[in-house]
Design a protein with these regions (language model features):
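ATP-dependent adenylate-handling ligase core
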Residues: 292-353, 379-388, 410-411, 434-442, ...
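Short, hydrophobic alpha-helix immediately C-terminal to the catalytic nucleophile
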Residues: 104-105, 260-264, 353-354, 375, ...
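Short, motif-level signal for alpha-helix interfacial/capping segments enriched in acidic residues
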Residues: 9-12, 121, 346, 401-406, ...
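Short acidic/histidine-rich active-site segments
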Residues: 361-371, 377
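Cysteine-centered catalytic environments shared across enzyme families
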Residues: 1-338
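Adenosyl-5′-phosphate
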Residues: 1, 214-217, 222, 358-365, ...
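Compositionally biased, low-complexity peptide segments typical
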Residues: 602-616
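Hydrophobic (often cysteine-bearing) scaffold residues that line and stabilize catalytic clefts
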Residues: 17, 96-99, 118, 227, ...
Length: 635
């Protein structure tokens, strides 16, 4: 994980512009604390903040072509770089061992028409001194964040985060995933497109002609087994590709299906270095797994069980509700959104990332993307047809860069940790999204993501392989969301809500929790561009707006993460109802005042260790620190 920032279309280089680019880069130095680099020349300035993972010694950026005519700043990882290097052996004089340098070799050979050859997560800016032109591009799904802006003088700006552009240019917006921007044309082009984005291209896949009109449950076992095997093999290959690293790495293990599958596969291959085609022993053969939650949370219990089963060195991070509340203001600054679901889920991940960083881990694999690809959210039980199901998965993938990808990337990057997501691997998507949608469906009480469960059931405890979906922010502890609702409801008055549209005419908050997050967001990012960068659409249980038409009961539900009692009943109808009434104010204050302290537990087959991560933190004056406007960005 790194940070990039810069300016194009410069008519005359000045010290002021260079200083501006440096200040832009400094805003995102948390993403790349290992080294800073800058290029100033021609009509461009490119700045780079590096987190060194591959080739730490010589892979500093910006990168240059052998003749120094092309310069490149990249945030990302190119998983197939070894294959590309082999193709250009003897044709291109590579200057470093960086995986990203293959972008320069491809550009030299093919101009701008090379993006499809990359399998990885990336956002990059390339300047060509010979043509005085530039290219900006982003990966297919938008795993790596990127923004583009402009000013009244015609300069084009780019940056990994909002904070690199806020206050530096007149307007900006998210750079679209799967697109590139070419300077001489001055417009965005889509480079990533797939046949599976159209239902007609996948509706008969893997299915014999005689079964094509059959109900999902009656599709032949042979055809079904073929799809299960395809998913298994493609995901194992994706995880193995993404284990490339010259520094210590780990896995995020929530105890849910998705992270457990990724962790189990990673453990299978962790003992050998993939850079040597698994011939040499890994430099760090012990795989470390990490889980976070309130004490006794469902996720922690299951994560512990999985870790014992697959044999990782497991680290369990306990946080208190108060510590979560104290972190909210920081979290909103780093993740750059006021979306309710994202803030709720990002807070424990942000706290976890700090501990991971303190242990010297620079990269972790995570399970994001499986719910979008396989229809794992509980509302998918209501999908009326295979076509509706498939089209919703495509919509969900197209919006991931605004939600889960943003959360996973920025929560970790806040502490200089890189997150990799094998379920969103480009080659894996081409297999998984071509699976017959009828096979993925989970009508009624049938469990979701059955294909994934059957593909990897033999690698996991059965209680986890067939465990039903939890929202991440529920799994870390049910009282977390309920307390957020209660505290933010007390912080925002009815009168403020009545005038919400006057204060926030763009994406007006629909409830007090959103209003409060929006207030904090505006303190950090006051521009209209910032407000428009965050999506604001009707949702239930993480659905898109289009899926609300699947069931009449969805219209009366207003919790986007699906954690309210009504949502649980309507979406699931499967799990025992959990109490979600708000705590009375006096009890809430008493509960939050308990000085439990964030704890780190290390569990492995050989030892158990416990260490207090933070000291006791009383509830000063019975008011959470995050409610104070002057609460600092860091302790």
């Amino acid at each position: 994980m790194c940070g990039i920032a810069g300016i194009f279309n410069i008519q005359s280089q000045t010290p002021e512009l260079r200083n501006k680019a440096l200040r832009m880069a400094q805003k995102i130095r948390h993403r790349g604390p290992d080294w800073s680099g800058i290029y100033v020349g021609g009509s461009a300035i490119l700045a780079h903040e590096r987190l060194s993972i591959v080739d730490p010694e010589s892979g500093g950026q910006p990168l240059y072509s052998p003749d120094h005519k092309q310069v490149l700043a990249v945030n990302g990882e190119i998983y197939n770089h070894r294959d590309i290097r082999a193709r250009y052996a003897g044709k291109y004089a590579f200057q470093t061992g960086s995986d990203c340098e293959v972008i320069l070799a491809l550009y030299k050979d093919k101009g701008i028409r090379f993006l499809e050859e990359l399998n990885g997560i990336f956002a990059f800016a390339l300047y060509d001194e010979e043509t005085d032109d530039y290219l900006i591009a982003r990966d297919p799904i938008g795993v790596i964040p990127l923004y583009i802006g402009r000013d009244k003088d015609g300069h084009i700006y780019f940056g990994s985060e909002l904070k690199a552009l806020e206050g530096f240019c007149d307007e900006y917006e998210p750079f679209l995933p799967g697109h590139y921007y070419r300077g001489r044309e001055g417009k965005m082009h889509r480079w990533y497109t797939r046949d599976w984005m159209d239902y007609a291209a996948v509706k008969d896949n893997y299915t014999p002609a005689a079964e094509r009109n059959a109900a999902p449950a009656s599709i032949g076992r042979t055809a079904y087994s073929t799809q299960v095997t395809a998913v298994h093999d493609a995901l194992e290959a994706a995880v193995q590709r993404q284990l490339m690293s010259d520094v210590p790495y780990g896995v995020l293990l929530s105890g849910g299906l998705d992270s457990s599958v990724i962790s189990a596969i990673a453990k299978k291959y962790a003992a050998k270095r993939i850079e040597t085609d698994n011939k040499a022993d890994a430099w760090w053969p012990q795989l470390h797994s990490f889980a976070v939650g309130l004490k006794g949370a469902p996720d922690l219990i299951k994560a512990r069980e999985v870790a014992r089963h697959i044999g990782t060195v497991h680290h369990e991070i306990n946080y208190t509700v108060q510590e979560g509340l104290d972190a909210v203001r920081d979290v909103i600054y780093f993740i750059e959104t006021y979306d309710i679901t994202t803030v709720r889920a990002s807070t424990p991940m942000y706290l976890l990332a700090r501990v991971i960083k303190s242990m010297g881990i620079k990269m972790v694999l995570s399970g994001e993307g499986a719910d979008e690809v396989f229809g794992g959210y509980l509302y998918f039980h209501k999908a009326p047809t295979p076509q509706a199901f498939h089209e919703e998965t495509v919509r969900k993938l197209s919006k991931l860069h605004l939600y889960d990808c943003l959360r996973a990337n920025k929560s970790l990057a806040a502490w200089g940790v890189e997150g990799r997501v094998p379920f969103l691997d480009k080659e894996f998507l081409d297999v998984a999204m071509r699976i017959n949608p009828a096979v993925k469906m989970c009508p009624g009480k049938e469990i979701e993501k059955k294909v994934v469960r059957e593909a990897f059931a033999d690698m996991l405890p059965q209680s986890v392989a067939w465990r039903q979906k939890e929202q991440f922010s529920d799994g870390v502890g049910y009282s977390w969301i309920d307390t957020l609702k209660a505290v933010t409801a007390a912080a925002v008055s009815d009168e403020q809500m009545a005038h919400a549209a006057e204060r926030f005419p763009i994406h007006t908050p629909q409830n007090k929790e959103e209003y409060y997050y929006r207030t904090i967001f505006e303190e950090h990012f006051p521009s209209e561009s910032a407000a428009r960068s965050v999506p604001s659409v009707p949702s239930v249980a993480c659905s898109t707006a289009e899926a609300l038409a699947w069931d009449a009961s969805f219209k009366n539900l207003n919790d986007p993460s699906g954690s309210s009692g009504g949502t649980r009943r309507s979406i699931q109808g499967l799990k025992k109802e959990l109490p979600t009434d708000f705590l009375p104010a006096a009890l809430l204050i008493f509960y939050l005042s308990n000085p439990i302290g964030l704890k780190h537990h290390c569990l492995s087959a050989n030892h158990t260790c416990h260490s207090t991560r933070y000291g006791n933190n009383k509830f000063q004056n019975h008011i959470p620190r995050f409610l104070h406007k002057d609460y600092p960005l860091s302790d």
